[in-house]
UniProtKB/Swiss-Prot annotation:
Gene for this chain: Defb14
Molecular function as annotated in GO: CCR6 chemokine receptor binding; chemoattractant activity
Cysteines joined through disulfide linkages: 33-62, 40-55, 45-63
Organism: Rattus norvegicus (Rat)
Family as reported in the entry's similarity comment: Belongs to the beta-defensin family.
Name of the featured protein: Beta-defensin 14
Length: 67
């Protein structure tokens, strides 16, 4: 039974996005952006937003309102 918990932890660690990782598919990047309270901006974030990540390798940025 403890093995299941260990495997679950490794699965979560594998799916959590790390800065600069390119092996994460674009759909997962968009999902994690929305989970963190952000949105995918095509070019730049708006003036009242901050960049918290990337939605794609081609320039889409994950932005959310500044706190």
């Amino acid at each position: 039974m403890r093995l299941h918990y260990l495997l679950f932890v490794f699965l979560i660690l594998f799916l959590v996005p790390a800065p600069g990782d390119t092996f994460i598919p674009k759909s997962l990047r968009r999902f994690f952006c929305r989970v963190r309270g952000g949105r995918c901006a095509i070019l730049n974030c708006l003036g009242k937003e901050e960049q918290i990540g990337r939605c794609s390798n081609r320039g889409q940025k994950c932005c959310r309102k500044k706190k």
